[in-house]
Amino acid sequence: RKSDGKIRVVTTIFPYYDFVRQLAGDKVDIRLLLSPGSDPHSYEPKPSDITAIENCDIFICNGGESDKWVDGVLSSIENKDVKVMKMMEYVPLRHEQSMDHDHEHDSHEDMDDDDEGHDHEEGEEYDEHVWTSIRNAERMSASIADELMSVDSKNSKYYNDRKTNYISQLDSLDKKFTEVANNKKRDTLVFGDRFPFLYFVSDYN
């Protein structure tokens, strides 16, 4: 903890930083390791990043191939009391699918290019963009809030109230997307890059 009594939370990517910010308000000190737009696949932690992880109370990462550096860092630090949350462990996972312009929208072939789904170890063939699903965001936010309440029990009511409010907002957004999907005129989405929204579109069939 910091001298002001706040717990320290470190996140790898912005979605989880934002979840913590929505759930914890000013009760925690949050550090984001990768700035928005950074490529997590090419990220290498700086010494200051490793120090931040060692000194934090909760460390939140995505897990999977994009965070393959995490286990090495965690094994190297002396503080073994850091609570580690790998978000891919908190939601149902979906296998990567080929969704480029040369395939039909409902293709279910595994991606086999050089950096996706190829020569991966077992357990690494899943699509890692789990945060794009609003329903996954609800699951992950609830788990993060529970961990905050466990580590910082004196502020449990505060975290629980914010969890209830935030999940209510997410649920409302989910209902709006459901309504849009139920009234859609087309079943096609066009992307000019690798398709990152498998979890999102799966929520709405």
Regions found by a protein language model. Give the residues of each.
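Extracytoplasmic metal-acquisition and chelation regions
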Residues: 1-205
